[in-house]
Amino acid sequence: SFLDTGSAGAITLPGFRRYVIDPARTTVRALVHICTAGLVTNLGELRDPRYLDVEGTVRAIEANRDIALGVKIRYSDVIVGEGDQARAALLAALEAAERSGTWLMVHIGRTPEPIADVLQLLRPGDVVTHSYTPLAGGVIDDRSLRVSPAAIEARAAGVQFDIGHGKSSFGWATAEAALAAGFAPDFISSDLHRGCVNGPAFDLPSVMTKFWMLGMPIEEIVMRCTSIPARKMGLDAGTLRVGSPADIAVLSIDEEPVSFVDCTGEHRVCDRRLSASYTYCSGVRLDPDILGVTEDLPVEISSRPMGSGS
């Protein structure tokens, strides 16, 4: 199962549904971007406030309740600007989530206002993603490596924290400090795109391996990748219970040293790694040719060299 976090906005969701979600052999759900056009690389989709679309976002969710689970905003200064303009975008995203009866996911890192001010606006069930970003404005201070007291308070109030390991959203030192302080993520996830599939994220088993190396028990890692996010998505998945859909990922443990890089360029050597062997969806084995994978975007990313990253 996949959760797409904001590729499409109100005006692009119909096309995203028709050409991506509906034909998919896997289960795909989506968050609707508060920018009406959706996520636009790093051009700053909300630097022009005319692209904020509360009404359209609410309508899009209501028309697609079976696949649209909530609202997404990328809350970085390069995306939303600064000051009142940035705050207006966050408030618009919150309004759309409130009016549609859904939850909001907030992307952080280079956050345009103090993280405490952001967290105090969030409601129980809202999600912060890129929680272990080494960038400024994260829930782990980029200088002191201390967990923000506001993050601890927000968690106690029901806000959830996601990893979303992509190109610039995971630091070894940040993750190590967070786990040592008892601030484990609610969800362990990848944020895969062309900027990170060849490093530093590679794939979800590689992200899982990083947490294994940091000392998290494998049972907890698996739960944070399967049953816990499945509940968040309202799916009868993430379980091997009799009668449940046979959605199964078969992982292998490769007992060989491998160097993993984080988003700051720091390398650490893991003495073993997880890699994907097989994936089944509703009992049907999914092979790369079924997914339409091209040579420049291989499925078995974890089998590639892992010594460098962007």
Question: Model-found features: residue ranges?
Answer:
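Divalent-metal coordination cores built from histidine and acidic residues
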Residues: 1-76
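Short acidic, glycine/serine/threonine-rich loops at helix termini
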Residues: 14-15, 40-45, 83-85, 116-119, ...
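Core-facing hydrophobic residues within beta-strands of well-ordered domains
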Residues: 68-71, 125, 185, 276
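Active-site core of metal-dependent hydrolases
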Residues: 77-198
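Residue-level recognition of short, solvent-exposed, well-ordered loop/turn junctions
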Residues: 123, 241-244, 281
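His/Asp/Glu-enriched, well-ordered alpha-helical/loop segment
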Residues: 173-255
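C-terminal cap of metal-dependent C-N hydrolases
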Residues: 246-299
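Long, low-complexity intrinsically disordered regions
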Residues: 294-310
